[in-house]
């Protein structure tokens, strides 16, 4: 304003940021008493003779005041309390601790056209709310996943993308995987971004593919456990990337079980009498092969549901067992198996369904057969806890084969 005196000193760092209705005292910003206050736009920010600033409306104004005869200039940014809008200078000047901004959604699985708003951790929520107008959201592949200024992501097509939220000098990432259930065939690869941004590839097998020399018949009858082990082992340990179920039998299974047990199941017994690896056996072999895991053998349904969903949200998989008997109704069905069956959970979708790797084709499923998208309850009704803590490496009933195995990324 032409009515303002000429300032001999311009102070712009830090800027004074206010929201409509706020009041501040200039003394606290300058550290000394002042006189002769002027505002370039009193409709935006007015100042009293005592140096009290009043934020009246959204916009910017300049305040000039005199301290010991020297005029100083301050810029005032006033934002709406419900929808803050901050300047580029403020974005650049905001300095926060390295871990100030974190999210509870490091990795997401979504289906095409689904939308979801990324959530901040409890330690970051207050900060994100306070500086909402400073948050910058970006997708590295907006043709796959779009993100708006509120952190709402929309899945557009199959693929993976990295969503970055930046606040001042810090940022956090969410890795989004847009998936379909179109995977089918004898063996197919499913790739995803993990919570660390690393690509992980699961090879999904059909157990009766008749593509496994020497073990075609065994795998067709009993191969669900071996296929599940091969899928997880190859995904979590690069030394075993792409390993076939037949190579698992002749490799890590033979290496980490006793010669007596391995020979009994693969040489001495008839095909009908041979047994698959137990969950205890799978867990043991994975640990011996450098893949960290936790075998949960007993649980209540409510505990397991919460635990399974929480683990899947980290982007890590779960190996589990189902049986013919429905634990809710007590009836026997052939929905998943006519005896016992091992499968792998790969993730939980933002719509609440789970992503399942299954080595058997299902007549009731209309999508691809290697990956299935189902309700978690559809699986949990057929899961069961261990009745004891048997250490049998091969199937020995509910004593060694109930529960589920949580897999962890190798650090």
Model regions and ranges:
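Mid-length scaffold segments of soluble, non-membrane domains
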Residues: 270, 274-295
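Active-site-adjacent structural segments surrounding the nucleophilic cysteine of cysteine proteases
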Residues: 179-273
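Active-site-adjacent substructure of cysteine-protease-like catalytic cores
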Residues: 301-366
């Amino acid at each position: 304003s032409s009515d303002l005196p000429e300032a001999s000193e311009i102070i712009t760092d830090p800027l004074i940021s206010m929201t409509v209705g706020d009041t501040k005292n200039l003394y606290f910003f300058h550290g000394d008493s002042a006189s002769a206050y002027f505002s370039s736009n009193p409709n935006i920010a007015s100042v009293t003779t005592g140096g009290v600033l009043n934020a009246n409306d959204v916009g910017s104004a300049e305040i000039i005041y005199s301290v010991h005869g020297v005029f100083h200039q301050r810029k005032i940014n006033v934002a709406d309390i419900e929808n803050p809008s901050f300047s580029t200078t403020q974005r650049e000047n905001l300095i926060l601790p390295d871990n100030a901004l974190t999210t509870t959604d490091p990795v997401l699985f979504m289906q095409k056209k689904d939308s979801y708003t990324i959530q901040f951790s409890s330690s970051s929520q207050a900060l994100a709310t306070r500086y909402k107008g400073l948050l910058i959201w970006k997708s590295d592949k907006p043709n796959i996943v779009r993100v708006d200024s509120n952190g709402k992501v929309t899945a557009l097509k199959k693929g993976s993308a990295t969503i970055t939220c930046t606040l001042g000098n810090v940022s956090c990432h969410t890795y989004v995987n847009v998936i379909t259930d179109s995977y089918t065939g004898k063996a197919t690869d499913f790739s995803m971004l993990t919570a660390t941004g690393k690509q992980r590839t699961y090879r999904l097998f059909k157990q009766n593919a008749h593509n496994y020399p020497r073990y075609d018949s065994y795998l067709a009858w009993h191969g669900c456990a071996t296929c599940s082990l091969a899928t997880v082992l190859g995904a979590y340990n690069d030394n075993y990337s792409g390993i076939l179920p037949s190579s698992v039998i002749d490799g890590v299974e033979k290496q980490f079980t006793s010669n007596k047990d391995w020979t009994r199941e693969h040489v001495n017994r008839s095909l009908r009498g041979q047994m698959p690896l137990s969950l205890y056996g799978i867990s043991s072999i994975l640990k011996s092969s450098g893949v960290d895991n936790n075998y949960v053998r007993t649980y209540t349904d409510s505990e397991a549901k919460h635990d399974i969903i929480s683990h899947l949200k980290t982007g890590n998989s779960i190996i589990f067992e189902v049986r013919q008997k429905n634990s809710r109704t007590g009836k026997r069905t052939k929905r998943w198996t006519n005896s016992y069956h091992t499968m792998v959970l790969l993730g939980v979708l933002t719509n609440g369904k789970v992503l399942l790797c299954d080595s058997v084709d299902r007549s009731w499923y209309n999508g691809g057969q290697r990956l299935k998208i189902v309700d978690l309850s559809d699986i949990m009704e057929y899961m069961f806890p261990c009745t004891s803590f048997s250490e049998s490496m091969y199937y020995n009933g509910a004593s060694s084969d109930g529960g589920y195995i949580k897999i962890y990324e190798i650090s």
